[in-house]
Swiss-Prot record:
Signal sequence range: none
Domain HTH deoR-type: 3-58
PROSITE patterns in alphabetical order: HTH_DEOR_1, HTH_DEOR_2
GO biological process assignments: negative regulation of DNA-templated transcription
Function: Represses ulaG and the ulaABCDEF operon.
Gene that this polypeptide is encoded by: ulaR
Protein's name in the database: HTH-type transcriptional regulator UlaR
Length: 251
């Protein structure tokens, strides 16, 4: 791994966590403590982070929350575009797909818009986009509106939300050899109910989330059919996932 790649991953860790220790950097990048401190010092000198005792802090900046209007500002946007394009190529004409919330989900929906596929979603920004673009087949899952996630959630135990799809595409805040993690419990529990009725589960996460644990375990690794991620993803974690039957696609 080059110095530039290490710096990129270190900054992505800070963007997600706000603070990292030297020990965490060593574990994540597989480097010596001396190299970790040297990387932190260089990025501190460039104003990219704030060096603190035994670690580093993110420089506080108000990052605008992404919307369909400023999607290009989403974190790791270019990598997410590649992931979405690769995911869209898995789906055959006439098939149905379940797409959940998030920037990668919106990018995937945008890729599929206009193709002869049925799109099932509870993510209102995506549903509104598909309707505005006159996509032929859109199913919007009903339920109570959740403002923080811009989604609808069905009551606990409701069977009305169990739409069977050939594919389910989802993402999360972290992916390890144990499985996929999500931080919003209500959203995760609503999506978990669908795992038993979809054909294949495909996880879409950028490389910064590989090896991270955050929130609750949404699905075990052996429940995941495929992972699509970036080329900088931790190879050790990918090997552990492959050993459990997960197909890996790096883009």
């Amino acid at each position: 791994m080059t110095e530039a790649q290490r710096h990129q991953i270190l900054l992505e860790m800070l963007a997600q966590l706000g603070f990292v220790t030297v020990e965490k950097v060593v574990e994540r990048l597989g480097i010596s403590p001396a190299t970790a401190r040297r990387d932190i010092n260089k990025l501190d000198e460039r104003g990219k982070l704030k060096k603190v005792r035994n670690g580093a802090e993110a420089i506080t900046q108000q990052r605008p929350r992404w919307t369909p209007m400023n999607l290009h500002q989403a974190q790791n946007h270019d990598e997410k575009v590649r992931i979405a394009k690769a995911a869209s190529q898995l789906v055959n004409p006439g098939e149905s797909v379940v797409i959940n919330c998030g920037s990668t989900a919106f990018l995937l929906g945008r890729e599929m818009c206009g193709k002869p596929v049925q799109i099932i979603t509870n993510y209102l920004p995506l549903a509104n986009y598909l309707i505005d673009q006159e996509h032929d087949s859109v199913i919007i899952m009903g339920g109570q509106y959740n403002k923080s996630q811009s989604i609808t959630l069905s009551p606990q135990g409701s069977e009305n939300s169990l739409y069977a799809g050939h594919w389910m595409f989802t993402s999360g805040k972290g992916l390890t050899a144990e499985g996929l993690y999500k931080t919003d419990m209500l959203t995760a529990m609503a999506e978990q109910k669908m795992l038993s009725v979809v054909g294949k589960l495909v996880v879409l996460v950028d490389s910064s989330k590989i090896g991270e644990r955050a929130g609750m375990l949404f699905s075990r690794a052996d429940q995941i059919d495929m992972l699509i991620t970036g080329k900088n993803a931790n190879p050790e974690i990918l090997q552990q996932l492959e050993a459990q039957g997960v197909s890996i696609l790096r883009v």
